[in-house]
From Swiss-Prot:
Pfam families on file: SLC12
Cytoplasmic-side segments: 1-23, 75-95, 160-165, 234-244, 306-345, 389-394, 441-927
Designated name of the protein: Solute carrier family 12 protein B0303.11
Entry's family note: Belongs to the SLC12A transporter family.
Length: 927
């Protein structure tokens, strides 16, 4: 039931059915209501009194609620795991996970015996109503009936039931009807069954006295056995599934509180059943049968259904333990049978043990070990959550002190209920934990020195082999140097670059740490003081700190990239240094990628010259260049992630240095002029894995790239901007179904213009499976020239497995651009225009009439291309266009005006320029 293994209720392993919160609610609430509420609760109220009962109910469900809250947190963070053991292994250390799984296995085993014993008591109640006895009318009859029910439960676990969900819903509906009739006093209360309890005759252990508070608490606490149920369900959970477990606990608590209240004010009709043997009238006897026998049947069905669930849970856990490397002694139990991997051996073994446990006695006896086992398990789980919360306070688990208090209360309650049994359980956990800790440490001591050494030497040897590989065997791999600044400030830009590399080629996130100025006369922070100075030992220490944080953030976001931070006073020089020094051997970047500089027309000449210098240096080094623009929302999210205009992270000094204030290379369409610069390094760095696995249409799981989703604490972002920020952060992570990429091949400047969109259509990209359309221009007007160019382009497309029918040759390129387009272009660059001087060339960042006249043909071509892009591709999901070449004779304002016009008012646009190597010279290797 809970796992993909041994699931007679769920769909097959290959099914894409997902469990929503309603399914989880039914799995959790069924055992919490049927057993105690209908079987023992009225006697508990009579013996303990109203006040004591309310206190016990409050404590019981408080423990269950806090434990369920922690369990939902674990499932939300590790929802990709299947089953209880794998989820615990992913969340905790190996020794604790295995030891805790052993304790929880005993809990489920005893709970199964308790459920079947309760069902057997209900069956015996029916027999006693008709004065029937099988053996002795006492414990022997109970053992016989529970054994038969155990065999039925075993058969149900092995037989697949396609309508299990409907059966569960039907039995839950019957249980709710029985509870409603009981609470409304339409029927006689089945709770008066206390007069029909099974005799202690032939019992191994006599029932404890009912007047003791520990006995009453032990009879009540099995109602809270489902605090950890959600950990068994596995990865077939929708995002709202944890809600079902918490709702089940809350609903059960309301039922028990209402029952105690109604019992106290005597809303129920009380009818003695002790004298209904032969002296009562016949009509009264029939009325008694009609009111109690259906209730007993409902309890029997509910208990058997709960036993089926717990037995499956236990079998799957035992099978998982057998498959773990730490429990090789039970390897023979790991084998599964059939397509659904049913753990038949585990089921047979556990059923045998369960029958022996059920033979001990009735519910009044078995409820004590069940209570002690679950209390101890809850104490261990909440204490470990407390330790995890101390190490990482950002985890959305219960408050630290609350987890510690619940853990201590559970441990004390287990000792109070039965101290001998509690100490025995503690010894089981201690022995298993210490044994596993010893085994794991011994293995680490034996292999710990060899594994890192062998890994290092093998990787180094492979690097040498790669360096010495002959040219005839070398293939082109896109190795990207991304000038992202702080990756936490621009997660969308990093995600887009990772969609191209997908961990199969090199990706380096470069961060150039500049020297900042303190123009306002105010006290400087320590970080600002360091940045005022020239690069020195202290600034290098800060560089190492930032470099470590970048790599930690990349690892937490599951981006296969390396961080590279350097100290340099100028951005262009820093980019040039990174291009020359980043990487090792053959693993060196051959593509420079950066974001589009939004608002360049409002910046100074020095700023745009700095930006243009990075591009021209890349062209001089003959590496590919990619400029990515996301005009809709931009990349920089730090200016939006605010609380009342102040940084929300604690490390304000470092945040002001690490965030978007340096360097301004990405699109900042969402930036506001008066917003302070402090941002969110710590919030992004401490992002945790979440259950937010997007579902495609029809309930399908998204591609493997969706496993890289993360969440931010909802209180860390102002409410009005939360949706906008989340859309910016995950824009290039969510897979877009039926996507389309339009490629505008303006000229052959290297195969990168076609290679980049091809890589974006591969598995793991947000545009996986996208349709590619290619637009190109023709220089000739005759059909012969057009056909020749079409054949050349078709040959290029075949290399990328693109159908030639998706090629469109546009003769409209020869037309001049409209006046409005040209006026918009001139409005952007006129600020930087200077008068023509005979003394020499204009200063950097400006141009004169002669330069704009000499570049008139290129300007006309690019402006016309911008019009055609908006005409044909306004509804595309991504536009890839050839990037103009940045030559020294081209003024930076004119060049930035070209790329601005090519990418404005369009979907996300990727301007690409290859390394000037033709397609025929590139040795590309495709899957």
């Amino acid at each position: 039931m809970p796992s993909s293994t041994a699931s007679s209720e769920d769909a097959p392993i290959t099914s894409t059915a997902w469990m929503n919160w309603k399914d989880v609610f039914l799995k959790c609430v069924q055992p919490m209501l049927a057993v105690v509420l209908l079987l023992r609760f009225s006697s508990i109220v009579d013996e303990a009194g109203f006040t004591t009962t309310i206190i016990l109910v409050f404590f019981t469900f408080l423990v269950s609620l806090v434990t369920g809250w922690s369990a939902c947190t674990v499932v939300s963070r590790k929802s990709s795991e299947v089953g209880f053991v794998k989820t615990m292994l992913a969340y905790s250390s190996t020794e604790f996970a295995i030891s805790f799984s052993i304790i929880y296995l005993f809990c489920l085993l005893v709970a199964t015996s308790t459920f079947l014993t309760s069902a057997a008591e209900a069956v015996l109640h029916i027999f006693s109503t008709f004065s029937l006895e099988l053996l002795d009318g006492a414990t022997h009859d109970l053992r016989l009936v529970s054994s038969v029910l155990s065999l039925i439960t075993l058969a149900l676990c092995m037989v697949r039931n396609r309508n299990a969900r409907f059966v569960r819903t039907f039995i839950f509906a019957l249980t709710c009807i029985a509870i409603a009739l009981q609470l409304s006093s339409v029927m006689f209360r089945y709770g008066e069954y206390q007069l029909r309890r099974v005799s202690d005759r032939n019992a191994m252990i006599p029932s404890p006295p009912n007047e003791e508070i520990s006995t009453i608490f032990a009879q009540l606490f099995p109602a809270a056995m489902c605090g950890l149920t959600i950990l068994n369900i596995g990865s077939k959970l929708q995002n709202t599934a944890p809600r079902g477990a918490l709702i089940a606990i809350a609903v059960s608590a309301c039922f028990y509180g209402a029952a105690a209240m109604l019992d106290y004010v005597e809303f129920f009709a009380r009818t003695s059943t002790s004298n209904s043997t032969g002296s009562a009238e016949y009509n009264e006897f029939l009325s008694y049968i009609y009111t109690t026998v259906p209730m007993a049947i409902v309890i029997t069905l509910a208990c058997v259904l709960s036993a089926v669930s717990t037995l499956k849970y236990a079998a799957v856990i035992l099978q998982s333990l057998g498959r773990s490397n730490q429990c090789r002694c039970i390897l023979w139990l790991a084998k599964g049978f059939g397509e659904r991997d049913i753990p038949i051996r585990c089921l047979l073994l556990l059923s045998t043990v369960q029958i022996l446990v059920s033979a001990i006695g009735s519910y009044d006896i078995l409820c004590i070990p069940t209570t002690v086992f679950y209390l101890f398990a809850y104490a261990l789980f909440n204490f470990y959550v407390f330790l995890v919360k101390l190490s990482d306070p950002e985890i959305p688990s219960p408050p630290t002190l609350l987890s510690l208090a619940i853990s201590a209360a559970c441990f004390i309650a287990s000792l109070y209920t039965n101290r001998h049994l509690a100490l025995f359980i503690a010894s089981i956990f201690a022995i298993s934990y210490c044994s596993l800790l010893y085994i794991i440490r011994r293995e680490r001591n034996e292999d710990g020195e060899e594994c890192p050494k062998s890994m290092y030497s093998s990787v180094l040897e492979q690097m040498h082999e790669l360096q010495q590989e002959p040219d005839s065997r070398r293939h082109f791999h896109p190795q990207i140097l991304l000038l992202s600044g702080s990756p936490a400030a621009r997660p969308g830009l990093v995600d887009f670059a990772h969609s191209i590399t997908r961990g199969k080629s090199l990706l380096i996130c470069g961060y150039i740490i500049p020297k900042i100025s303190n123009k306002v006369e105010q006290p400087m922070t320590w970080t600002e003081y360091l940045m005022q100075q020239s690069p020195c030992s202290r600034s290098y220490l800060l560089q190492l700190k930032i470099d470590k944080q970048i790599n930690d953030w990349l690892r937490a976001r599951e981006v296969n990239a390396f961080g590279a931070a350097i100290c340099c006073t100028k951005q262009a020089e820093g980019a040039n240094i990174l291009l020359q020094t980043a990487g090792l051997g053959r693993l060196r970047p051959n593509i420079l990628m950066l974001g589009y500089k939004t608002g360049w027309e409002k910046l100074s000449k020095e700023s745009i010259s700095e930006y243009y210098g990075m591009l021209s240096n890349a062209f001089d080094k003959q590496v590919g260049v990619i400029i990515f623009r996301n005009e809709a929302s931009g990349f920089d999210v730090t200016s939006s992630i605010r609380k009342n205009g102040a940084p929300i992270n604690d490390d304000e000094d470092l945040a002001e240095y690490v965030d978007s204030a340096t360097p301004k290379l990405a699109d900042q369409g969402s930036q506001k002029k008066d917003v302070p610069r402090g941002k969110l390094l710590n919030t992004f760095r401490k992002m945790s894995m979440a259950v937010n696995k997007d579902l495609e249409s029809g309930g399908r799981r998204s591609t493997s790239s969706s496993t890289r989703f993360q969440v931010i604490d909802k209180h860390s972002i102002s409410e009005p901007d939360q949706k906008i920020i989340m859309a910016q952060m995950f824009r290039f992570r969510k897979r877009i179904p039926n996507a389309r990429i339009d490629v505008f091949w303006l000229r052959e400047a290297g195969g990168l213009t076609m290679l980049a969109p091809y890589l974006l259509t591969q598995a793991g990209s947000f545009l996986e499976g996208a349709h590619i359309r290619v637009f190109t221009k023709t220089d000739g007007k005759d059909n012969k020239r057009i056909n020749e160019e079409q054949k050349n382009m078709a040959a290029i497309l075949r290399k990328f497995h693109i159908d030639s029918s998706d090629l469109h040759i546009l003769p409209e390129f020869s037309k001049p651009p409209c006046k409005q387009t040209y006026d918009e272009f001139r409005a952007k660059i006129d600020k930087y225009k200077v008068e023509t001087s005979s003394s020499g060339e204009p200063v950097d960042g400006s141009f004169d009439n002669n330069q704009i006249f000499n570049l008139r043909e290129k300007t006309r071509s690019f402006l016309r291309a911008s019009e055609l892009i908006r005409e044909h591709s306004s509804d595309a999901d991504l536009i890839v266009c050839t990037l103009p070449s940045a030559r020294p004779e081209i003024p930076s304002p004119i060049y930035l005006g070209w790329i601005d016009m090519l990418s404005r008012q369009t979907p996300p646009t990727c301007l690409v320029r290859g390394n000037q190597v033709s397609m025929s010279a590139l040795r590309l290797k495709f899957p």
